[in-house]
Amino acid sequence: MIIIDGSYGEGGGQILRTSIALSAITGEPVKIINIRANRPNPGLRPQHLNAILALKKLANAKVEGAEVGSREVTFIPGELKGGEIRVDIGTAGSITLVLQALLPAMVFAKDTVEFKITGGTDVSWSPPVDYLINVTMFALRKIGIEGEIKLLRRGHYPKGGGIVAGYVKPWIERKELIAEEFENIYKVSGISHATNLPAHVAERQAKAAMEELKVLGVPIEIKKEVSHSLGPGSGIVVWAETECLRLGGDALGKKGKPAEEVGREAAQELLSQVKTKACVDKFLGDQIIPFLAISGGKIKVAEITKHLITNVWVVEQFFGKVFEVKGGVGEKGEVRVVRKAW
């Protein structure tokens, strides 16, 4: 059994998500201790619990310590089968963070996995669903992963109620990812949404983002989406199309925050990524690590984050030396697979 210290590095829920996904993939039992030890409210939160329970079902696993507040979890995986996975987080807990745990395991299931998850689609401290659909999945297709994620309904803090569904097929053809530096940006796309709010909120967010992004001198198309759900909320995701991958920026609206500020924030986030010329933005940088370990390849990242370093560490607890990372936290960097996980 592999023992993972959950207080390592940034000590958040990511250690848990990656560890249990890798346990499910490898069939190697894992015990995670000191879960979220560095957080103000340590232990499992509802979205972590839901990720574990979904992986338990997917991997026919035995689990000990799976309850809110638990600081130690043991996961003993069985066989990764396909089928249907239903997850109701029950709060505005992040759907995308649950999917971050599920995706690496789902691609190793024997058959196609269909999923439907209810919770928060656009919430603080997690990737918005539009980023996952348009940036993360775009990158995963490059390495041979087939699947689709669809947004059925938005869910914001505190009520949630968002619904995301989709499917992932078994990963048969594993393509190496070489994504170092881009030369050209072809266009910028985006989605600006307003839920249970006036249409002008989405329009103002989009307009402000477009004003900032004009400096790139490329076509810009930001869709405006107005919808209804359990509670109000707004946000915007923008992404740049290059010859290698897509780089993204995003921002969430909140009460008292002008829509223009939200739009500018997302645009500035994107501009800070693309000025590095790295093919991989700082958000995708950590998300891609478990997949890169298996596909092989070499990437340049706009910024090495603590999340990336932590994910590298977790992968290497299972597989030994896999990566060579150049660059310090907060700097542009490079990640190279020196030995594929398998």
From Swiss-Prot:
Alphabetized InterPro entries for the sequence: RNA3'-term_phos_cycl_insert, RNA3'_phos_cyclase_dom, RNA3'_phos_cyclase_dom_sf, RNA3'_term_phos_cyc, RNA3'_term_phos_cyc_type_1, RNA3'_term_phos_cycl-like_CS, RNA3'P_cycl/enolpyr_Trfase_a/b, RPTC_insert
Subcellular location: Cytoplasm
EC nos: 6.5.1.5
A single Gene Ontology CC term: cytoplasm
The UniProt record lists the keyword Protein transport: no
Activity regulation description: Inhibited by GMP.
MF terms in GO: GTP binding; RNA binding; RNA-3'-phosphate cyclase activity
One Pfam family matching this protein: RTC_insert
Reaction(s) catalysed (UniProt annotation): a 3'-end 3'-phospho-ribonucleotide-RNA + GTP = a 3'-end 2',3'-cyclophospho-ribonucleotide-RNA + GMP + diphosphate
GTP-binding among keywords: yes
Matching Gene3D superfamilies: RNA 3'-terminal phosphate cyclase domain (3.65.10.20), RNA 3'-terminal phosphate cyclase, insert domain (3.30.360.20)
Coiled-coil segments on the chain, per record: none
Temperature dependency: Optimum temperature is 95 degrees Celsius.
Primary location: cytoplasm
Keywords associated with the record: Cytoplasm, GTP-binding, Ligase, Nucleotide-binding, RNA-binding
GO BP terms: RNA processing
NCBIfam families recorded: RNA_3prim_cycl (TIGR03399)
Free-text function comment from the UniProt entry: Catalyzes the GTP-dependent conversion of 3'-phosphate to a 2',3'-cyclic phosphodiester at the end of RNA. The biological role of this enzyme is unknown but it is likely to function in some aspects of cellular RNA processing.
Miscellaneous note of the record: Generally, RNA 3'-terminal phosphate cyclases are ATP dependent, but P.furiosus enzyme preferentially uses GTP rather than ATP.
PANTHER family: RNA 3' TERMINAL PHOSPHATE CYCLASE, RNA 3'-TERMINAL PHOSPHATE CYCLASE
Protein name: RNA 3'-terminal phosphate cyclase
Lineage: Archaea, Methanobacteriati, Methanobacteriota, Thermococci, Thermococcales
